[in-house]
Design a protein with these regions (language model features):
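Catalytic core of non-heme Fe(II) oxygenases with the double-stranded beta-helix
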Residues: 1-96
């Protein structure tokens, strides 16, 4: 997820099964206020990105990467999703 515009209140990407980092430097990138939301919520900062893999090499989902886009309370958020389709053992087809 790439944040193209994040001039907003709210609108983060929440991973409820991740543990909050303990180092204060992370507060530039994640919501550190205790608002009752479980897990880690990445702030929608323009020019920043979050990468995660949804599946392991066997195609099983990672429970830790269950996530949700939180509501934008005010302002504008524009994000760009980039899906990676690499699978272990994949052999690309012939070049065109």
């Amino acid at each position: 997820m790439v944040y193209l515009q994040g001039d907003c209140e709210g609108g983060g990407t929440n991973f409820p099964r991740l543990s909050m980092p303990k180092e204060a430097k992370w507060c530039d990138y994640v919501e550190c206020a205790d608002d009752g939301t479980e897990g880690v919520t990445f702030k929608p900062r323009a020019g920043s990105a979050v990468f995660w893999m949804n599946f392991d090499a066997e195609g099983k989902g990672y429970r830790e990467t269950i996530h949700a886009g939180m509501p934008v309370l005010s302002g504008t958020k524009i994000g760009l999703n980039i899906w990676s389709w690499y699978q272990a053992g994949h052999k690309p087809g012939a070049s065109v």
